[in-house]
Amino acid sequence: MEKDMASLTFYGGVGEIGGNKFLVEDGDTKIFLDHGQSFSFGEEFSTGWLSPRGRFGLRDHFALNLIPKIKGLYSEASLAPTDYPYVDPEFQGVFISHIHYDHNAHIRYLDEGIPIYLGETTKRMLDSWETTGIGRYGKHDYRTFKTGKNQVIDDIEVEPVHVDHSTPAAYGFIVHTSEGAVVYTGDFRLHGPK
């Protein structure tokens, strides 16, 4: 049987600020790079005091086309109020580049069985947000990494690389597939040492 080609699919973060959701597939391996919320998220339907109702999981998000319907990605609890069927996870991981909401806000809806990879410091910040109530991400299989510690997931190897950004512990990723490398910068700025 011939192996499928590596591919890259953009579900957000193209032609907009934030909302990065980039899917990398190689053979049977599927990983996301970030899973955030766009800066313009729902602005045509809501305001600061009127937004998708959290108690309805993804129902409002799907009805208003604010988040993509992707089979095997979302938790059963998030899908329960919707007519979208739950299926077992079909993704092997989600890599979060840094703590900013436009790169991680929608991990709260992901199936708990999908590992979430993030830098050690980003994980500590996320934990503090959970503790203080700033963010609600839920229980997940969090796996931390450091620069120089590549993560191998089936057919894909992800190399985390520190980038300069307005928050500590920001990463870009070099994603090694069977057909070559994909470089994902996350967010970066051109300050600091060269």
Q: Can you name each region flagged by the protein language model?
A:
Residues E2-E16, N20-G93, D102-K194:
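His/Asp/Glu-rich metal-coordinating catalytic cores
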